[in-house]
Amino acid sequence: MAYDLLLERFLRYAKINTRSDENATRTPTTQSQVDFALNILKPELEELGLSNIHYLESNGYLVATLPANDDRLTRKIGFISHMDTADFNAEGVSPQVIESYDGGIIPLGTSGYNLDPADFPNLQNYIGQTLITTDGTTLLGADDKSGIAEIMTALAHLKANPEIKHCEIRVGFGPDEEIGIGADKFDVDDFDVDFAYTVDGGPLGELQYETFSAAGAELIFHGRNVHPGTAKGQMVNALQLAIDFHNQLPAEDRPELTDGYQGFNHLQTMTGTVEEANSSYIIRDFETESFENRKATFQEIADKMNQAYGQTRVDLVIKDQYYNMRQVIEKDMMPVELAKEVMEDLGIVPVIEPIRGGTDGSKISFKGIPTPNIFAGGENMHGRYEFVSLQTMEKAVDVILGIISKP
């Protein structure tokens, strides 16, 4: 269904810079997210007639309730999207609207960059549709401004059509998802629903209840610097230690060589000098045993290297980040089955695949609210090639409305 103001709402949100900052220690990490919540979203929720609208300074979430209008619909269902955007330029976002896309190359403004089907064959799925792209100088922010716009549009549709019967709805717009800390302080008692959905997925039909289990590994390599001309038997090159460590990890377990249910070890940064070097990894797997084995491999390599040198040359710290929410959701698949049934009723083919990443829903699920993820429409997210289909966004609104009105 076409919805008035969905496009306008998304464009307005997308133009606001709400980039998060992984180096900040406050919550939210940027003031722009607070301003977006209080100055843009909160007044809109008030205008739409929601109740119990409140901003939680403790965690940066803006929360509101739409009471049920049918006593027979007793569920309490939440919808959650994040306000921040990824680590890419978000200042001066100037979206392009391409109506009736013809399948060709889309110039991204005057930037010299193009959306080319030869590079992005997923464009062929959108011929004839209205696409919103960047101008090539910023990201778009469909992750997750599209989700916010879809939730708001569903609420506006309910206000304009009070005859539509629905259960109690709770909405939550949160911070800092892109840097992995947005749901750390999520208040499940305040949100108070039976289950929820993050509206934070990608293409049409995505329905996800499995994420990676995730950890981060930080390594410090301690070298000994002497003049290279007299280094034999004396120098210990910390950079070489970092290389040696990396080369002992399974060569095939890298992101660029894995897909589906395969996990990986990803070297994100390696910096240093002969005297000291640092490496930072992320560790990902879907299965608990494999996840634990990966972490154990890191420790075994560090221990072996320290033993070989007879002293501590490698310091390793591993911290778990989040866990596969399947462990929670598979105990009661009703939220997944409900969304699947609604999609099928709407003629949408559910695409049930694992998320090769994480969502706020993972941490929220482990806090006590099962929270699978549904599509929001974005493609090529986190950069200048990001785009979203208006028609996919409309169908996401259809799914939200179907979920809250399903007996």
UniProtKB/Swiss-Prot annotation:
Subcellular localization(s) per the UniProt record: Cytoplasm
Annotated keywords: Aminopeptidase, Cytoplasm, Hydrolase, Metal-binding, Metalloprotease, Protease, Zinc
Reactions catalysed, as given in the entry: Release of the N-terminal residue from a tripeptide
Amino acids binding Zn(2+) 1: 82, 143, 200
PROSITE patterns associated with the record: ARGE_DAPE_CPG2_1, ARGE_DAPE_CPG2_2
Hydrolase as UniProt keyword: yes
Pfam families: M20_dimer, Peptidase_M20
InterPro entries the record matches: ArgE/DapE_CS, Bact_exopeptidase_dim_dom, Peptidase_M20, Peptidase_M20_dimer, Peptidase_M20B
Keyword Protein biosynthesis: no
Cofactor names: Zn(2+)
GO cellular component: cytosol
Function, as annotated: Cleaves the N-terminal amino acid of tripeptides.
Protein name listed in UniProt: Peptidase T
